[in-house]
C-alpha cells in the first residue's frame, strides 16, 4: 500500500514523498522527471516493496518545486548541487545508514541521479536510468548534432518568462502534447486515461514555476543566436565519470531524447548494462512498467 509523508530536511527543504515497504529494509529511491510527480512510480514502489521482489523500502519524493514539496523562488536553487543535496539529505532522513540499494530515475530525475552517482558513489550500490541523458553525451549532442538541437528546442520555450501561462492555457493543452506526441492516448501502449489525466491536473494546478526552473537554471539547452547555452560549456572529466553499476533502459522512439544520446556512454560508465526497447518512447514507465520492473529485477539480483 502506498502511503505519503512529508519530510523536513536540515537545509530547509521539505519533500512530499510516496512510499511502500518497511523502513529499515534496504532503501530504493525513485526520482521523477518533467512534467510529472512521484505518483508515476506507484506501480514500481509496490512491486519492489513486496518480499518476493526484494522487500525494499521504496520511496519516491516529489522533487523540489513539485506537488507540495518546497519551491524556492530563486532560479539558482534548482542547480544540480542543490538537487543532489536534497537526495543525500533525504537518504539520511529516512534512516538509511548503508548505501542506497538502488537509485532509479527518469528524465530530470535522471539528471539528478547521474550527478548523485558521480559525486557520491560510496552512497549507492546500483543506478537505474530510464531515458535520461548522461551530461557528457547530452552536451556533445547539443553542441554537434543538429537533430538533437531540434529535438531539444522545446527547452528554449520552457525558459520563457510566460511559459507557465502558456502551458496552463486551454486545460494544459501544450503539456498534454508532451505525452500525446508519443502515442500516450492512441499508441499500442496507450496509457493516458481520464484517471491519469486527473492525477496530472492535480499536480499542475499546484503551479508550474518550480518545474520550469529546472530548465531555467541549466545551461544544457540548444544554443540560440542570443544565447550560446551548451556551446559555452565545458565539463571536466571528473564531473562525468560514474563508477557504480548502472542499468540504462532506453525507449528508442523518444522524440525528445533520441538514441544518439546513448552512443559512447560506456566511456563514462564502465560498468554499464544497456537495454534498448525498440518500440518504447520517453514514457516507458507508463507504457511498460512491468517490463521495466523485470529488467530492474534481473539487474538487482545480479
Predicted feature residues:
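Conserved HGGG/HGGXW glycine-rich cap/lid loop of the alpha/beta-hydrolase fold
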Residues: 18-70
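Proline-centered flexible-loop/turn and helix-kink motifs
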Residues: 35, 54, 121-122, 270, ...
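Catalytic histidine-centered segment of alpha/beta-hydrolase-like enzymes
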Residues: 280-289, 293
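Residues at the C-termini of beta-strands that transition into short coil/loop
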Residues: 8, 21, 62, 131, ...
Amino acid at each position: 500500500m502506498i502511503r505519503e509523508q512529508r519530510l523536513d530536511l536540515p537545509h530547509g527543504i521539505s519533500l512530499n514523498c510516496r512510499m511502500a515497504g518497511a523502513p529499515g529494509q534496504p532503501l530504493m529511491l525513485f526520482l521523477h522527471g518533467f512534467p510529472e510527480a512521484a505518483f508515476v512510480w506507484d506501480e514500481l514502489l509496490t512491486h519492489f516493496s513486496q518480499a518476493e521482489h526484494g522487500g525494499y523500502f521504496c520511496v519516491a519524493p516529489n522533487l523540489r518545486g513539485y506537488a507540495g514539496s518546497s519551491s524556492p523562488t530563486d532560479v539558482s536553487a534548482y542547480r544540480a548541487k542543490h538537487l543532489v543535496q536534497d537526495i543525500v539529505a533525504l537518504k539520511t532522513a529516512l534512516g538509511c545508514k548503508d548505501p542506497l540499494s538502488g537509485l532509479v530515475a527518469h528524465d530530470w530525475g535522471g539528471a539528478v541521479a547521474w550527478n548523485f552517482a558521480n559525486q557520491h558513489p560510496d552512497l549507492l550500490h546500483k543506478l537505474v536510468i530510464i531515458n535520461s541523458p548522461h551530461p557528457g553525451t547530452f552536451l556533445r549532442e547539443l553542441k554537434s548534432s543538429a537533430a538533437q538541437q531540434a529535438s531539444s528546442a522545446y527547452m528554449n520555450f520552457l525558459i520563457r518568462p510566460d511559459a507557465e501561462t502558456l502551458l496552463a492555457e486551454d486545460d494544459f493543452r501544450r503539456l498534454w502534447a508532451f505525452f500525446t506526441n508519443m502515442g500516450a492516448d492512441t499508441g499500442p501502449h496507450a496509457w493516458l486515461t481520464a484517471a491519469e489525466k486527473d492525477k496530472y491536473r492535480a499536480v499542475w494546478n499546484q503551479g508550474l514555476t518550480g518545474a520550469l526552473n529546472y530548465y531555467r537554471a541549466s545551461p544544457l539547452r540548444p544554443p540560440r543566436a542570443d544565447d550560446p547555452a551548451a556551446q559555452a560549456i565545458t565539463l571536466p572529466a571528473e564531473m562525468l565519470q560514474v563508477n557504480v553499476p548502472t542499468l540504462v533502459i532506453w525507449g528508442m522512439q523518444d522524440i525528445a531524447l533520441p538514441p544518439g544520446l546513448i552512443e559512447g556512454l560506456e566511456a563514462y560508465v564502465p560498468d554499464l548494462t544497456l537495454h534498448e526497447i525498440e518500440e518504447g518512447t520517453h514514457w516507458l514507465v507508463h507504457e511498460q512498467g512491468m517490463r521495466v520492473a523485470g529488467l530492474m529485477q534481473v539487474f538487482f539480483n545480479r
